[in-house]
Amino acid sequence: MFDIGFSELILLMVLGLVVLGPKRLPIAIRTVMDWVKTIRGLAANVQNELKQELKLQELQDSIKKAESLNLQALSPELSKTVEELKAQADKMKAELEDKAAQAGTTVEDQIKEIKSAAENAEKSQNAISVEEAAETLSEAERTPTDLTALETHEKVELNTHLSSYYPPDDIEIAPASKSQSSKTKS
């Protein structure tokens, strides 16, 4: 790159040693080597970009030539294909319009069905609320012993649910009461 021979390199090292001294010479060599690496990297990057641009330009030129040759030779075939595609698109558009017209009447019928289903749901809800009112009246007529039986059943159910989540505490681990602790001290 610089046409420097071995003897010239030795001469530069001796001159650098005299000018910079033994402490600064290694630092200066590292700095110069970093500059050389950076310059080489930039040069390689520029060369790669130029090669890519040239390839891209060649491809664009060849594509333009191929298009001009193919369009002249294939124009009757392309026009037939374009006409066929337009005919198919018009046919599909007509089918979609027919389906849309049919769907419009179907939507109206569906709205009527939904309204009737909502009315039936209201009627069944009213019937359920009447049954619930009858059950509450029958609960009000129950005797206190029936209510007590229900309460004990509910307590047992609650205890089983709680014991599944929280295991029962050990009685032996419980702290001693004040009277027991005073007896042990005396």
From Swiss-Prot:
Cell location: Cell inner membrane
HAMAP family assigned to the protein according to its UniProt record, in alphabetical order: TatB
GO cellular component, one term: TAT protein transport complex
PANTHER family, A to Z: SEC-INDEPENDENT PROTEIN TRANSLOCASE PROTEIN TATA, CHLOROPLASTIC
GO MF, any single term: protein transmembrane transporter activity
Keywords: Cell inner membrane, Cell membrane, Membrane, Protein transport, Translocation, Transmembrane, Transmembrane helix, Transport
Segments for region (Disordered): 120-186
Membrane topology: Single-pass membrane protein
Protein family (similarity comment): Belongs to the TatB family.
Annotated organism of origin: Haemophilus influenzae (strain ATCC 51907 / DSM 11121 / KW20 / Rd)
Biased composition (Polar residues): 177-186
Subunit (UniProt): The Tat system comprises two distinct complexes: a TatABC complex, containing multiple copies of TatA, TatB and TatC subunits, and a separate TatA complex, containing only TatA subunits. Substrates initially bind to the TatABC complex, which probably triggers association of the separate TatA complex to form the active translocon.
Protein's name according to its UniProt entry: Sec-independent protein translocase protein TatB
Record's function text: Part of the twin-arginine translocation (Tat) system that transports large folded proteins containing a characteristic twin-arginine motif in their signal peptide across membranes. Together with TatC, TatB is part of a receptor directly interacting with Tat signal peptides. TatB may form an oligomeric binding site that transiently accommodates folded Tat precursor proteins before their translocation.
Chain ranges passing through the membrane: 1-21
Keyword Translocase in record: no
GO annotation, biological process: protein transport by the Tat complex
